[in-house]
């Protein structure tokens, strides 16, 4: 058969409102990759796989940074907090953020699509909703206008805005961010 591999470097460790995005699909990958959120910024990544796949001969795999005890301790502490508090917060705040961005899309024609899970949301900008022609300048303008108001945003791809706030975000910060985005988009019209 074919191996199912999930790259959860960005989407794992609670980001999507579940510990791993694979859980949303109801599947169990053969191999799962995780890093970034795993150790709260400490340099650590992991390959999680079924035993039959990970059975390698001695010396066939090595790592320059593998097994660093400080990074491993950071990962254990991170996982404890994420599992206890932040997965549920990411799910709840992600629903709030997604609903808010979808509301913005009703009022701003430049938003062509909104998609995401938990606190990992993409907002696609278009010149025209019928042709769906990408609008990279709209993303650049929004990122710059938001920065001037104290809101840090990041574009990705050709014409998509990536929204991936911290897992500790609260409703007030979500609402403030949405208000600032709305102000920037309204001023651009």
Label every model-predicted segment.
Residues 1-189:
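Conserved N-terminal phosphate-binding loop of PLP-dependent enzymes in the Aspartate aminotransferase
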